[in-house]
């Protein structure tokens, strides 16, 4: 069996992709491991139910929505290769590192309305190369075919 830690460097080298992309992917994976732990613990960790706040779409946030969002933001802000991020749970993008070369967009907990009935949820993410110039909303508005990487992590 090949682990992700073994696969990523080989894949990046085989396809002449920058090592920094692997680092950003690893940051997403590390955050998802933490989110998975919270999802599995559920009621035992006291993380089920409403958070008492809403997101930008006007949806009621679940406690796990907020936790997953905070975990992903912290993990990505810690990576110097991340220039900025955009989350479904935030009003606007979050700038990270001026010299970073990647943007990460995500829904931290897709399907969170399913949490209380024990149906699968997940994290959707997309990694884009940051365009030249100052970080702006338009930086995140790129064609899907221009993604450096994307994925769905199922919990």
Language-model-derived ranges and their functions:
Residues 100-155:
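DPxDG-like acidic metal-binding loop motif
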Residues 1-109:
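N-terminal subdomain of lithium-sensitive/metallo-dependent phosphomonoesterases centered on the IMPase/IPPase/PAP
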């Amino acid at each position: 069996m090949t682990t992700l830690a073994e696969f990523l460097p080989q894949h990046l080298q085989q396809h002449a992709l920058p090592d920094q992309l692997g680092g950003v992917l690893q940051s997403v994976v590390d955050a998802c491991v933490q989110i998975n732990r919270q999802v599995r613990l559920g009621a035992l960790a006291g993380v089920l139910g409403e958070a008492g706040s809403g997101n930008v779409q006007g949806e009621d946030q679940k406690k796990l929505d907020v936790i997953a969002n905070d975990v992903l933001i912290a993990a990505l802000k810690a990576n110097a290769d991340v220039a900025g991020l955009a989350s479904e749970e935030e009003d606007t993008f979050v700038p990270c590192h001026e010299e970073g070369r990647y943007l990460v967009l995500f829904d931290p907990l897709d399907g969170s309305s399913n949490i209380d009935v024990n149906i699968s949820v997940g994290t959707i993410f997309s990694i884009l190369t940051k365009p030249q110039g100052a970080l702006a909303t338009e930086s995140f508005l790129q064609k899907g075919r221009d993604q450096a990487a994307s994925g769905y992590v199922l919990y």
